[in-house]
Amino acid sequence: MAKAATPKTTAAAEAKPAAKAPAKKAAPKTTAAAKPAATKSGAPKAAAAGAIGHITQVIGAVVDVKFPEGQLPLILNALEVDNQGHRLVLEVAQHLGEDTVRTIAMDATEGLVRGQEARDTGEPIMVPVGVETLGRIMNVIGEPVDEAGPIKTKATRAIHQNAPEYIEQSTEAEILVTGIKVVDLLAPYAKGGKIGLFGGAGVGKTVLIMELINNVAKAHGGYSVFAGVGERTREGNDLYHEMIESGVNKLGGGEGSKAALVYGQMNEPPGARARVALSGLTVAENFRDQGQDVLFFVDNIFRFTQAGSEVSALLGRIPSAVGYQPTLATDMGAMQERITTTTKGSITSVQAIYVPADDLTDPAPATSFAHLDATTVLSRSIAEKGIYPAVDPLDSTSRMLDPKVVGEEHYAVARQVQSILQRYKALQDIIAILGMDELSEEDKLTVARARKIERFLSQPFFVAEVFTGSPGKLVDLADTIKGFKGLCAGDYDHLPEAAFYMVGSIEEALEKAKKLAAEAA
């Protein structure tokens, strides 16, 4: 084929391959200027940057590239192709035979032709890192997509990194207060931990993540990184403008901005969606290694798995359960293990996790469970009652709900709330068949309290003010505990259920009860 054109391309021709490459150059000495390590006589010939290959096959997002003998790029290296004036990055995924690599494209492959040149960069995909990324949106390969000019950073970093060593990791237990009652009371988040928001389609995962960005990122003062993985472009756009309006970011980035955004949305090819979480994580890791406490938001981790499964089939791997890739647990582990707190700084990660068909046993959400410190499960049955956030108080868990961490009072109130709600759940079948009248007096009281607790777990959000018309509320942890303690003890048995719906603290519920009484009079 076109192999004769550049039989032994030198790495000196890295930026612009010369048309007349020396025909008889010795291949073993081919090295990149940036990689002197490869000059050692025992080093693999494959480590040569600047090697030129030619495309032999394009199947959707998967592209095969043939290289001259002895110049095979390493696995995970980035190759660059000029696709009609547009820089297309391919990531090496497999070695086929002695001279061909199978790669995953990070953008659309329309316009590629067989025989086209592909240049080995000699390193993995590199993204810009540092304070210059704050207030900006970039894509999976670190290119700006917010039309605010290039991102001029002092450093770049490879998106594939090893997880921190055991000796570097920190294990202190501290709570991250969110101002959301149901979360802070029943499944509190760990500072420097991993939090998963589980839910089916349309139960409020993205709204909850936006509220957390609003409450925590503003109060937190440190830097935040948001990775939009395979979700709606409209929501990504809304978030960008909302951050500017609320003062978290400045238009066009620069001083005063607190959050970096990395997007690879629904319309992107699977290669971009499978790697954009790593690009975002790389930006967050850089802040952590500089001693910052970083918040890392991912919406949606399921799309990372989904993209991996799309690519896996194209790479010719035999699928495992439910059609997922056989490397599901490995892919997830490689990413999740990097999200950790070290002795230098911390990463607190909040991840929205879509649950296909509301089935928590599906391999994708089930694999994510193992990595999390706290899980917030959003339930459709609660959303149907109009209770938002639709957090399931019995399904949501946290390792922080421990008297040694949260204190005896908080722990006792949380467990009491759960036991009342559990009893109500057990009685629901009896109520449905026989009605309330058949219950004992004690059970009637439990049901009445449970219904009030259920409504008091709802809360108006700042980010949903536009839809609900009611101003958002941020509730202090002490007020949350006080309110639920009183509800469990029966201090508010005389108030109507409606008084507890969509309010912040218990004082607001008392005010609302007075209003309702005045209206009824």
Curated annotation (Swiss-Prot):
Compositionally skewed regions (Low complexity) per UniProt: 1-21, 28-42
Signal peptide range in chain numbering: none
Alphabetized InterPro entries for the sequence: AAA+_ATPase, ATP-synt_VA_C, ATP_synth_F1_bsu, ATPase_a/bsu_AS, ATPase_alpha/beta_chains, ATPase_F1/V1/A1_a/bsu_N, ATPase_F1/V1/A1_a/bsu_N_sf, ATPase_F1/V1/A1_a/bsu_nucl-bd
Documented EC number(s): 7.1.2.2
Chain ranges passing through the membrane: none
Known role: Produces ATP from ADP in the presence of a proton gradient across the membrane. The catalytic sites are hosted primarily by the beta subunits.
Subunit and partners: F-type ATPases have 2 components, CF(1) - the catalytic core - and CF(0) - the membrane proton channel. CF(1) has five subunits: alpha(3), beta(3), gamma(1), delta(1), epsilon(1). CF(0) has three main subunits: a(1), b(2) and c(9-12). The alpha and beta chains form an alternating ring which encloses part of the gamma chain. CF(1) is attached to CF(0) by a central stalk formed by the gamma and epsilon chains, while a peripheral stalk is formed by the delta and b chains.
Name of the molecule in the record: ATP synthase subunit beta
Species for this entry: Brucella canis (strain ATCC 23365 / NCTC 10854 / RM-666)
Gene that encodes the chain: atpD
